[in-house]
Amino acid sequence: MGMLTSLNSSKNHLSFMSQGVILITGATGHLGANLLRRLLSDGDTVRVFQRPGRDHEALQGLEVDIVYGDLRDPESVEVAVKGCSRIYHCAAMVSTIDGDQAHKREVYEVNVLGTRHILEAALRQGVEKVVVSGSLSATGHDPERPSDESMPFYPFDRQMPYGFTKHLVEHECLRAHAEGLKVVVATSCAIIGPHDYVPSRMGQVLIDYAKGSLRAYIPGGFEFVSTLDIVEGHVLAMKSGRSGQKYIISSTYMSVDELMTLFGEVTGCPKPRLRLPAGVMAVIAEVADRSWFRLFPNRPRRFTPGAVRLLQMHRKVDHRKARDELGFRPTPLSDAVRAAYEDFVRRGVIVPKV
């Protein structure tokens, strides 16, 4: 059973309940930490669902209630959901490795079963609406045109467990919608921005770049989204998103070369000299993955075959649906990179070079 506590013991929990509590899962993650701050600045009362023992740096100084528990435990999920009027389900186990069977099972249980538990509890507790964070990895890809919400996911392509589970998450949302729950999927691309405490994959690349430890990179490209934009997309989806629908939230497509140039402009550090051919890196990643897989099957790695494949797909998206139905308007990605860098400097993660 989950345990309810608060970072602000002077706040009466019953007053929180009467004001219409918003629940956020994954509030210590990159998206969740930024969404939490946005909701608090809007004057909302927020509860977060947190695994015991997790770092609370992302929550320090913020007036929130915490329910401790695990998405895989329906009872603790029920405790978290009870009394909430709306839910942002941002928590997920993100991974670009295939991993062993135990790893795949954990990704499935956290992402798919965890979402199922949230949605089922929301139905039982009479929650008004749920916004679930989706992933572009669960959206179909056509090299001839940008991806949109109508593009089907093809399960027999070479898929990473993470992308496949996020596809199944969308099915869980459709099932809950059919059962009467108002639920919307807000699909994210690669996120860049401040309050990146873990840090994220892109955040770590920026840190390494600023420290001069990023020796090489590979060409490619991807669709990126600023924390400001992905948070705005979630808030808009909660406000006016149609139940049973998903909306892709993106700022812009950017090549890796362009991203490295932008990192250089923001940090004042030179671009890595070594630009590895994509084909060569793909082979190296495959060989290294097989070697590392035998020794360390579940250890995160920078250049996995899955990550290389994603960059080489040059995925672009069409976010007209979010623009037309939600009123979404993207902001410059350069602002997000600068905000991320300044936040890392403020927290002492990066020491600026003079």
Where are these regions (language model features)?
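N-terminal Rossmann NAD(P)H-binding glycine-rich loop of SDR-like oxidoreductase domains
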Residues: G20-D42
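NAD(P)H-binding glycine-rich loop region in Rossmannoid oxidoreductase-like domains
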Residues: R54-Q60, V64-L113, A121
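Conserved Rossmann-fold NAD(P)-dependent oxidoreductase catalytic core, especially the SDR/UDP-sugar
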Residues: E109, L113-Y162, V184
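Glycine-rich "substrate-gating" loop/helix at the edge of Rossmann-like oxidoreductase active sites
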Residues: R158-P161, C189-V198, Y217-L228
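Mid/C-terminal beta-alpha module of Rossmann-like enzyme folds, strongest
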Residues: G233-R301, H319, D324, S334-V354
